[in-house]
Amino acid sequence: MTARHFNRITTAAVLLFVSAGWLLAPAFAQSEPLSVEWTLAKTGKRLEREALIIVTNAQGQPVSDASIEVKVDMPSMPMMHAVPKATATPAGQPGRYKTKFTLEMAGEWAAQIEVTKPVRTKVVKKFNAD
Ligand SMILES: [Cu+2]
């Protein structure tokens, strides 16, 4: 093997390595979990709450086109409540979504926020309602 052959093989190997990285990087980035934060606000109606949900990716950028459902329940009272699932809709700014739900009593609640698109992510947020 001449030095020239060796250089060609090295160059080919480096190119292959680099292009594999370029091809695989987006696939890995898409499977990284999303970060889901929320704030709850009271509306005029007793026990009704409006949620503002903020979804960001692993790089901290807002995630648009997310599909989000919120299911609330009381951890201390399994099977006792049946608040309908709430679907969140875009709230005007990238990565922000809003939804409303009405609780059935005051006390400790837990919300399961489930993102099904673009990356499956599930978070649970506990909160107190008075
Ligand atoms: Cu209850």
For each feature predicted by the language model, list its residue ranges.
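Intrinsically disordered, low-complexity segments enriched in polar/charged small residues
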Residues: 9-13, 27, 54
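C-terminal segment of classical bacterial N-terminal signal peptides
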Residues: 17-27
